[in-house]
From Swiss-Prot:
Annotated spans, Disordered: 29-76, 162-213, 325-354
UniProt main location, coarse: nucleus
Annotated signal peptide: none
Protein name, entry field: Suppression of tumorigenicity 18 protein
PROSITE patterns, sorted: ZF_CCHHC
Amino acid sequence: MQRLKIKRCILSQKEPKVAYDCSMAKKRRAEEQALGVPVNKRKSLLMKPRHYSPDMDCKENPDNRNEDDGLETNDHSTADEIVVKPMDKTLHLPAQESSLPKEDQYACYPELMVKSLMHLGKFEESESVQTVGENLNGNGIQSLKAECDEANECFMVHSDDGRDKVHHSQPPFCSSGDSESDSDNTENGWGSGSNSSEDTDTHKGPKRKLTYNRKDLLEVPEIKAEDDKFIPCENRCDSDTSGRDPQNSHMEPLAVKVQPSFPEVEESESLATVIAESAEVEKAKGSLSLLEQAIALQAERGSVFHHTYKELDRFLLDHLARQRRQPKVTDASGRQIFNNKHSPRPERREAKCPIPGCDGTGHVTGLYPHHRSLSGCPHKVRVPLEILAMHENVLKCPTPGCTGRGHVNSNRNTHRSLSGCPIAAAEKLAMTQDKSQLDSSQTGQGPEQAHRVNLVKQIEFNFRSQAITSPRASASKEQEKFGKVPFDYASFDAQVFGKRPLLQTGQGQKAPPFPESKHFSNPVKFSNGLPSAGAHTQSTVRASSYGHGQYSEDTHIAAAAAILNLSTRCREATDILSNKPQSLRAKGAEIEVDENGTLDLSMKKNRILDKSIPPTSSHTTIATPSSSPFKASSLLVNAAFYQALCDQEGWNVPINYSKSHGKTEEEKEKDPVNSLENLEEKKFAGEASIPSPKPKLHTRDLKKELITCPTPGCDGSGHVTGNYASHRSVSGCPLADKTLKSLMAANSQELKCPTPGCDGSGHVTGNYASHRSLSGCPRARKGGIKMTPTKEEKEDSELRCPVIGCDGQGHISGKYTSHRTASGCPLAAKRQKENPLNGTPLSWKLNKQELPHCPLPGCNGLGHVNNVFVTHRSLSGCPLNAQAIKKVKVSEELMTIKLKATGGIEGDEEIRHLDEEIKELNESNLKIEADMMKLQTQITSMESNLKTIEEENKLIEQSNESLLKELAGLSQALISSLADIQLPQMGPINEQNFEAYVNTLTDMYSNLERDYSPECKALLESIKQAVKGIHV
């Protein structure tokens, strides 16, 4: 009983107002319950939820007390963190300080039970004996009665006090002075009321004493809780076990109140109650320990799960945030890198396309996303001419005399700076050679080395006059080096634009052995023009004792002037030769050159008479050091050659390069080398020369002379791909344009497959990608469909090819299957190849009207050099002119052999064989085409027949459908009319027996000759009458 009062005092912690309301309510319900039947309190307490919280009774209705689950206490603080404060102060819990109010509801009950009953076992024996002794003294009956009333009040308050109470904070503990008011504790729903008004003064003594003992009980846990805040689970389980003793003690006072109030019976029952309590406490300890262990295990498991899920949620949120940030960072960094990479430099950010309305996007070639000039603008076609001209003037190459064509790396057709200019590269190379030659000339040159270099330079002279030292071991290299002299663009600029390069005379040279020889300088002024062909003399110096400064460059100047002035056929006389130096002047008409480098090739020239001064001796030499050196494409053609051509022929007669006119009878020899030397030895009026020994030319030099670049004005340097330093064909020439390449391809037409309609692709064996003859053609021996001529060609006979033996097939360019003129005829091209240099006109040309054409034999006028005109009618723009000039130096046999080697055909038999095969293919194709035409006519006739049959079938089907519909109508009418008439041995007429009915009727009417009975005749008459109404 004393434990019940101790617990009731500990748990009665409410505010004064709430405690007062609860005490009044308990007193009122206790009086009402005194007349009623008591309820088993043990059973009602056992029905509480496992984690029942007394605060729920104060906050919620009794119906909602069991809604919350006890598992939610996993995340809340346990009873180990409870701190017990003095009785007059507020008891603060760690869970109460948190922001979750639900945690107090689940944690208050077990925490208070554990802390309040923790040390109950220490005072259990002493207090229980003292309480029993006091209760059994003279006033034992009244004390038991008071305790029973208090128990009833406690029970009644427990059942209904949740409706009148409100959630509150932890109230202070009760003091000894407040024991008579007995304020309630709403956390566990048990109320304890004071019955001081009913008890006497003797009853108050034990209560005060008990209150004093309760104060001692509360002070001891306070000290222990401050020292040790973490209480073991065993003490908590023991305290909970002892905390359930008051529950068992409530049963006995209720039973005592019903029995007769005799002192002896009450004393015996109180002793039994104390004994029963001690037994039940031991049983409750075991169950409570198991319960608390399960609660602790569940709390730990819940905390682990809660922590795990919390960490998982945090990880997922971080991962999602990183994924969202990563694309943004990548995009931003990518944009920054792209902008840094492709953004123009600070000084070029203002550069943009000059075309109005263009933002610079869309480069023509697609290599760049933007453009900043007219070169790559896709809207360049729609640009006004003023803007185009203004920008084109700015975008020209700064090198004088350069048109911008012939870019070095071949990625572009033109260039606008010195970086890709071949002329600038040649000038730079020439300057380096000048420096190296100047350094080498200072060291001196031996007589043997000078002799060897002079021998090499007999074919072509270098325009520099200084000496070149070379060791004896590298003699063959020197011969290869000087065998083909590169074209000097700087000298061309000097001739055209008046630039005078510095001349350096070699030192250490020996004096000439002829004292009479005088060196004439050639101070010709080339401000706006080029020297004429007749204003120069040839240099016949061949002796090894002469220095390089004594060699004349007039032959090269004359060749260049002749190439540039071929269309005018200028024939200028040689200038007056004076004894004084610097008296040789070119007084002929000069070629005018405008600021853009365009030459004036008009035919109006002033012819000046020759005024020659006899030389001082027969051995006088005219050696003109080149004040303005000039060479053209390694051609060795002197002024005498052109003068002979001009003197022997008129202005309007085309030049025939197949025969050399300047030779005398003594100089006609079979050796091509001697013929070349004889050309140089030919003497004309106004020239002074000396006989000199002629050393033999090497065969190696002769071969190298044959394989030079055929492009006019190209020295072979500056290969397109950069893999080679020089080239000897048009394929790698940076100065060759597309028209020249197409012309060369047209002239070498034998390298294409002769099969009509075949482009050369698809070799039979697969070893080669293309073929040039019928041997590997997959279409040669197949009976495929031939590209037949169109109907217009069959109708118009005038539009056929004029070449005899040609059927109009096999166009040269491959774009058309047939041709109607001789321009694309492959047979005409073959016949031109057979006789390239004979002046005889072809047979098919006789039928056509004579038109102005190129005077060079074998040239069809296509492929102008500067690409201004599609065709040319003079030698000025002929790309084959340079080749023809070079071929004059060799015999006709070498030329024919070279043509046959390039064409790939060694004899005429193969050509005839190919022609026969082509004719056979044409015949087979014609037969196949005739068969195909027959088949097509048969197919068309069969198709027309099928169409007529189908139309007839459609008509028949329509008629059948109409007849069926009519038959159905007649049958229905017959059935309706004969419905009342019934034949013997047959049922009434219907759709099932309609056919049998009709058959019997037809038999009856067909056999009318028989003698029927009167009944049958009457039936037939009735049938006739019924059928009369049907109209067919």
